């Protein structure tokens, strides 16, 4: 199992190829590829490479799936005995990022098997049973 720890949006995140992650807003158009070069750690076949602070020559390639807003967080401030109340809401802008491959020193150490980022659906035949119409 190959994985990497990246830094994006001021947070550190463990990523694996073939999975999507919700990260801070990246100002990139949806359905385009994006490369993250702030890789802190790379693990492949029980070999761990730790950067100081970043791993040289390591990148994480992925696709921006969509942008959306997170759940609303309510901030309520009240001063007792002063009749002062403030109610504010905040919704964080989020980007859904699909990890396609982890590159280390020019070679791909982790990638999706089929190379596609959109899930495929299987064709399923629906069997219908014909019943007799009985009138009562």
Curated annotation (Swiss-Prot):
InterPro entries per record: bL21-like (IPR028909), bL21-like_sf (IPR036164), Ribosomal_bL21 (IPR001787), Ribosomal_bL21_CS (IPR018258)
Keyword rRNA-binding among UniProt keywords: yes
Transmembrane segments: none
Ribosomal protein recorded as keyword: yes
GO cellular-component term (any): cytoplasm
Subunit structure: Part of the 50S ribosomal subunit. Contacts protein L20.
Pfam families: Ribosomal_L21p
A GO MF term: structural constituent of ribosome
Function of the protein: This protein binds to 23S rRNA in the presence of protein L20.
PROSITE patterns: RIBOSOMAL_L21 (PS01169)
One GO-annotated biological process of the protein: translation
Name of the protein in its database record: Large ribosomal subunit protein bL21
Keywords from the UniProt entry: Ribonucleoprotein, Ribosomal protein, RNA-binding, rRNA-binding
Entry's family note: Belongs to the bacterial ribosomal protein bL21 family.
């Amino acid at each position: 199992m190959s994985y990497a720890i990246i830094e994006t949006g001021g947070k550190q995140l463990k990523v694996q190829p073939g999975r999507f992650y919700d990260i801070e807003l990246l100002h990139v158009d949806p359905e385009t590829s994006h490369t993250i070069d702030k890789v802190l750690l790379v693990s492949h076949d029980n070999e761990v490479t730790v950067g100081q602070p970043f791993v040289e020559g390591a990148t994480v390639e992925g696709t921006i799936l969509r942008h959306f807003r997170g759940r609303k967080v309510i901030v309520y401030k009240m001063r007792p005995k002063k009749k002062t109340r403030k109610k504010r809401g905040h919704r964080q802008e989020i980007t859904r990022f699909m990890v396609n491959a982890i590159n280390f020193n020019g070679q791909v150490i982790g990638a999706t098997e089929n190379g596609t980022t959109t899930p495929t659906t299987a064709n399923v035949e629906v069997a219908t049973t014909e019943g007799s119409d009985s009138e009562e």
